[in-house]
C-alpha cells in the first residue's frame, strides 16, 4: 500500500464519519454495519496498517470516498456541502486535541472501559454508543471550536441519535489523527488535488 493510499483510507474514515453524521441528522437512520465500523475504529490500538483500523477492508468507507471525491473535484453539482464542513471541522478539532494532553489522557483511560462494554454488549449496543458519545462530550465538546450539526430537530433531539452523532464524530477525529500519523496534511487538499483523485478513483471503484 502506497503512502498516499494510506492517507486516503484514513481521510476516507473522516469523510465517512461526516456522511453518517449528516444522514442521522437529516433522516435519523444509519446502518449497523457503517456504525459498527466507525465505533470499532476507536478500539484498534495497534493496527498493522491503516485498513486494519476499519476491520481489514474499506467496504464501509465507500460513501466517505465519494464525499471526498466530490470535495476534491470541486463540482458544485455533486459537492456534499455538509459532510465537507463536518470533515474539515474534524480535521481542525484533531489539531486542537493534539495540544491537550489532559483530554488525550481521559480518552486513553476510558477507551478500555468502552472496550469491555463492547465485549459484554456488542459494538452497536446503546450502552456502548452512549458511553462513546459521553466521552466525546466530556473531551471534544469542551474545546473552543464546536461542530454545529444541521438537520431535522426531531432527529437531533432524540438522545440516542445525539449519542450516535457524538460517537461518530469521536471516531472521525480518531481517523483525522490517523491521517496525521501517516503524514496527511491539509495543504494536500488544496495543492495535491489531482494526485489524490488519481489514487482515490481506484479505491472508490474497487
Swiss-Prot record:
Gene expressing this chain: hflD
As for membrane topology, the entry says: Peripheral membrane protein
Which coarse location class describes where this protein primarily resides? Answer: cytoplasm
Question: What's the protein name?
Answer: High frequency lysogenization protein HflD homolog
Alphabetical keyword list: Cell inner membrane, Cell membrane, Cytoplasm, Membrane
Instruction: State if Ribosomal protein is listed as a keyword.
Output: no
Q: Which domain of life is it from?
A: Bacteria
Record PANTHER family: HIGH FREQUENCY LYSOGENIZATION PROTEIN HFLD
So what family is this one in? Answer: Belongs to the HflD family.
One GO cellular-component annotation of the UniProt record comes to:
plasma membrane
Q: Where in the cell is it found?
A: Cytoplasm; Cell inner membrane
Amino acid at each position: 500500500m502506497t503512502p498516499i493510499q494510506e492517507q486516503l483510507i484514513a481521510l476516507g474514515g473522516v469523510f465517512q464519519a461526516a456522511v453518517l453524521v449528516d444522514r442521522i441528522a437529516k433522516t435519523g437512520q444509519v446502518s449497523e454495519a457503517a456504525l459498527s465500523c466507525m465505533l470499532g475504529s476507536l478500539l484498534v490500538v495497534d493496527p498493522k496498517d491503516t485498513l486494519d483500523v476499519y476491520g481489514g477492508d474499506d467496504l464501509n468507507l465507500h460513501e466517505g470516498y465519494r464525499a471526498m471525491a466530490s470535495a476534491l473535484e470541486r463540482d458544485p453539482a455533486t459537492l456534499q456541502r455538509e459532510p465537507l464542513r463536518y470533515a474539515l471541522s474534524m480535521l481542525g478539532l484533531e489539531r486542537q486535541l493534539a495540544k491537550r494532553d489532559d483530554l488525550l489522557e481521559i480518552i486513553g483511560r476510558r477507551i478500555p472501559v468502552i472496550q469491555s462494554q463492547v465485549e459484554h454488549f456488542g459494538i452497536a449496543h446503546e450502552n456502548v454508543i452512549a458511553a462513546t458519545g459521553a466521552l466525546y462530550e466530556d473531551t471534544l465538546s469542551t474545546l473552543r471550536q464546536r461542530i454545529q450539526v444541521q438537520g431535522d430537530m426531531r432527529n437531533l433531539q432524540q438522545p440516542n441519535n445525539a449519542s450516535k452523532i457524538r460517537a461518530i464524530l469521536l471516531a472521525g477525529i480518531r481517523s483525522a489523527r490517523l491521517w496525521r500519523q501517516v503524514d496527511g496534511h491539509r495543504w494536500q487538499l488544496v495543492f495535491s488535488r489531482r494526485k489524490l483523485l488519481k489514487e482515490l478513483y481506484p479505491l472508490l471503484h474497487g
